[in-house]
From Swiss-Prot:
Similarity comment text for this entry: Belongs to the elongation factor P family.
Record function comment: Involved in peptide bond synthesis. Stimulates efficient translation and peptide-bond synthesis on native or reconstituted 70S ribosomes in vitro. Probably functions indirectly by altering the affinity of the ribosome for aminoacyl-tRNA, thus increasing their reactivity as acceptors for peptidyl transferase.
Gene3D superfamilies per record: 2.30.30.30, Nucleic acid-binding proteins (2.40.50.140)
CDD domains given in the database record: S1_EF-P_repeat_1
Keyword flag Protein biosynthesis: yes
Localization per record: Cytoplasm
Alphabetic keyword roster: Cytoplasm, Elongation factor, Protein biosynthesis
One Pfam family linked to the record: Elong-fact-P_C
Protein name as annotated: Elongation factor P
């Protein structure tokens, strides 16, 4: 059992006698400092969604699910297709992929964790760090060397724009933290 404020996107909880995957959570504090947790939930059995509110201390049953390491194969709208080491393919609905979708690109080498409930793939979790190539960034600003100088950059194969260190150039490979979406370091 977990409290509502410990629940994260990707967790599966029992709610109204059905398993629901948590797609989004938002915690706010009321005037008396009690936490209120709003959750967007998707029912795994009847393919419906709902938004509901819980008190932060409400207890919930979290279901332990099977997880497999898989690699991304291709996108067949509205499904992302992943493959395990034994070449079995698994379809994951685009809305269940969540924020991980922005990091998924053709030819990616990183292994994702696909979560299953009763044999159905229900979510994808990216590794905590990934390596991507910088597709566009401005040249380094001359003379601006005081402190941690950052500039915007776009990645190859995605719409992601993030702030990178001033010394990063087009074509460089960089490491990105998928939890925060922030630049960590240049790799090459």
């Amino acid at each position: 059992m977990k409290t509502a404020h410990e629940i994260r996107p990707g967790n599966v909880i029992m709610f109204n006698d059905s398993p629901w995957v948590v797609q989004k959570t938002e915690t706010t504090r009321s005037g008396r400092n009690a936490a209120i947790v709003k959750m967007k939930l998707k029912n795994l059995l009847i393919d419906s969604s709902t938004e509901t509110t819980f008190k932060g201390e409400d207890k919930m049953d979290v279901i332990v699910l099977e997880r497999l390491d898989c690699t991304y194969s291709y996108f067949a709208d509205p499904m992302y297709v992943f493959m395990d080491s034994e070449y079995n393919q698994y379809d994951v609905e685009a809305e269940n992929v969540g924020d991980a979708a922005k990091y998924i690109v053709d030819g990616m080498e990183e292994t994702c964790q696909v979560t299953f409930y009763e044999g159905k793939a229900i979510s994808v979790e990216m590794p905590t760090t990934i390596i991507r190539e910088v597709g566009y960034t401005e040249p380094a600003a001359r003379g601006d060397t005081s402190g941690k100088v950052m500039k915007p950059a776009k990645l190859v194969g995605s719409d992601i724009e993030l702030m990178v260190a001033d010394f990063v150039k087009e074509g460089d490979k960089i490491e990105i933290d998928t939890r925060t979406g922030e630049f960590k370091k240049r790799v090459n």
